[in-house]
Design a protein with these regions (language model features):
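Extracellular beta-rich repeat passengers
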Residues: 1-107
Length: 107
């Protein structure tokens, strides 16, 4: 149900278009690092989701028809929280962010 699942790695992605993701647009997990620049994401429950010791940096994103723009969690005890840092997202108010204990979301 996710468009892009990134696990246990380091990723650099430019010019990404994702559409009609049922659950998550981008899901980064299990101690991964993802740098994403120039993202267009449409029709998803959660646009950007980090979990379990993962870090995401997003620069230049356009999000359309999403329920939550960013979520950052720890779901497994053997991992720490996650971090999402972003710059220039068209629409991401605090009410559209979900942050779990020990996780960080900032711009």
């Amino acid at each position: 149900d996710d468009c892009l699942n990134l696990r246990k790695g380091i990723y650099y992605i430019e010019n990404l278009l994702l559409s009609d993701c049922k659950d998550k647009g981008i899901n980064v997990s299990y101690n991964s690092k993802a740098n994403i620049e120039n993202l267009l994401l449409k029709n998803s429950t959660t646009a950007i989701y980090a979990k379990d010791s993962s870090d995401i940096y997003i620069k230049n994103a356009i999000l359309k028809n999403i329920e939550y723009c960013i979520a950052s969690y720890r779901t497994k005890r053997n991992y720490a929280g996650s971090k999402v840092k972003y710059k220039n997202i068209n629409y991401c108010p605090e009410s559209k962010k979900i942050k779990g204990e020990g996780s960080v979301i900032n711009n």
